Amino acid sequence: MRIINAEGLILGRLASRVAKMLLEGEEVVIVNAEKAVITGNREVIFSKYKQRTGLRTLTNPRRGPFYPKRSDEIVRRTIRGMLPWKTDRGRKAFKRLKVYVGIPKEFKDKQLETIVEAHVSRLSRPKYVTVGEVAKFLGGKF
């Protein structure tokens, strides 16, 4: 089992690396999901996520698609988009993923990994928003 600290990691790069690990059969736990980073212009990011939450089907609005508002679920959904979700292999891989806000008690004393290639310090122009800020904007709990 790999425990990855998402603090200061770019969400898309983190998601692609984690999706690869999941497809290889590893169990992955992500902690500090609210501290992951989405790069780009703040207003554009907020408008994109706000537009997603308003999507619905005109015939039956209860059918979806449903987009998350909590920060841990935003990270899970991003990783799900990089897996072959409609196949049995992709669904089994997705079940091996756990995402947490903060660090739970059972992982406090464990060794946390980070992904150096996905760190925000590698950006030349540091324009970004944390996943926690996006979740707060959408009305999520965390």
Swiss-Prot record:
GO molecular function, one term: mRNA binding
Highest taxon of source: Archaea
Gene Ontology BP terms: negative regulation of translation; translation
Function: This protein is one of the early assembly proteins of the 50S ribosomal subunit, although it is not seen to bind rRNA by itself. It is important during the early stages of 50S assembly.
Pfam families: Ribosomal_L13
Similarity annotation: Belongs to the universal ribosomal protein uL13 family.
Name listed for the protein in its UniProt record: Large ribosomal subunit protein uL13
Record-linked HAMAP family: Ribosomal_uL13 (MF_01366)
TM annotation in the entry: none
PANTHER family: LARGE RIBOSOMAL SUBUNIT PROTEIN UL13, RIBOSOMAL PROTEIN L13
Keywords: Ribonucleoprotein, Ribosomal protein
Gene Ontology CC, one term: cytosolic large ribosomal subunit
